[in-house]
Amino acid sequence: MLPDLPIQQKYADVYKALVANQKSYERGLEDLKHSIDALLDKIKHTARMKSVGDLFADVDSRNEGGEISDVRGINITKRFMPTVADTNGVNLNTYKIVKKGQFAYSGMQTGRDECIRIALYDEEEPIIISPAYSVFEVKDKTIIPEYIMVWFLRAESDRRGWFMSDSSIRTNLDLVRFYEMKVPTPDMKLQKSIAEMYASYVTRGNISETLKKQLKDICPILIKGSLEEGLKHA
């Protein structure tokens, strides 16, 4: 039995308020993303361009003692993830170590996936990755790692990587070609602002997703509450 209209309206208003709150976060998220994209588009025409090879230094530190067992890979969203490869019986001593503030890169299948697989590691405890990956750290002290990561998160960077990938079946973006890619290098203050804006964008995105989940979870509760209140007034 449905509750009276005033009770229905009461619970509908609660739901509408929650939806409006989530939508406001979503709109703010879109506005912030547009601001970041516009700023990056501007600096690529005004800031000095440097090649990736001038910004990165190769790091080859191996898990020789076997102390680290946390094996990761990189997904197409440019984030570290637990490896999907079967490591049973694999000698992890040859795997490369990645520490906080370092990048991992794989040039494989860049063209096929239309994605440059690069990720910045931001956790305290080091991890290991396949020897097939490359590990970098920023050697140019005027460049902030987080800013470079934001640059490579752009769809335009992925399209450029696809264009520069080779003609093999796997359409790889080998290191030589990757090192030739250009990155605009504004002053550090602007780099920091861009990195902070993107961090805020990620935080707001997480909040928006949490609110969406809460909306799903609260619907049965609101319906139950309205029915119970309706019975009390029956």
Model-assigned labels for residue ranges:
Residues 50, 99, 176:
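Structured loop/turn residues at beta-strand edges in well-structured enzyme cores
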Residues 4-65, 187-234:
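Non-catalytic DNA-recognition/assembly elements of restriction-modification systems
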Residues 100, 104-153:
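A short beta-sheet element
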Residues 72, 118, 161, 173:
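Short clusters of hydrophobic/aromatic residues that line enzyme substrate/ligand-binding pockets
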Residues 32, 81, 128-129, 144, ...:
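N-terminal alpha-helical segment
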Residues 146-168, 174:
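Short, positively charged
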Residues 1-9, 126-132, 166-192:
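A short glycine-rich beta-alpha junction/loop motif
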Residues 53-103:
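Sequence-specific dsDNA recognition surfaces
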